[in-house]
Amino acid sequence: MNIPNYAEFYERRQFKEGFKGNVSVNIDGEDVDFGGSLICQFGSSNKVKLAIEICEDLWTPAPPSIRHALNGATIIVNLSASNETIGKSAYRRELVKGQSARLVCGYIYSTAGDGESTQDIVFGAHNLICENGTVLAEAKKFTNEAVYADIDVDRICSERRRMSTFDVNVDENMKEAYKYVTCPELKKRTLELK
């Protein structure tokens, strides 16, 4: 996990970069896994494999999402606090689209909303869902609206099998630190919008 310390960001005053490994912490008698090398598996097919990166990770030369995807993650979620400046939303959109294309994955990008803005920084709730280089859903800036889309995980798995160069790029050292956590089956439900 990467901590920005440039331009308007001074996060190293309060935060330390995360570690790449994993730890298990006992919370109220239950062991809970924490770390930058976790992949959550959902369902019986083991195709929905979710990994997380945080804000600045996406903007670095070698984002953790590369390791996540090479270790099987089909969906990457980025929890962010990316501010608004001139031209940044277009750049951010291309960054998310490009990462989803390069990694042949679904990429969910969720950033801070306008209610989290201060006198120094403005957040616009620029939330995106991309799949393999295509924007599936995008929030209108400054609306704090929820976005949702269907990510075709079967297609992602098929595309990865078809690409002869996807698996050959896996460095064995990248696989050692990963832990796969099985999560409860996701229930399909219908949303009623009002």
Question: Would you name each region that the model predicts?
Answer:
Residues 1-194:
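Enzyme catalytic cores with a strong preference for nitrogen-chemistry domains
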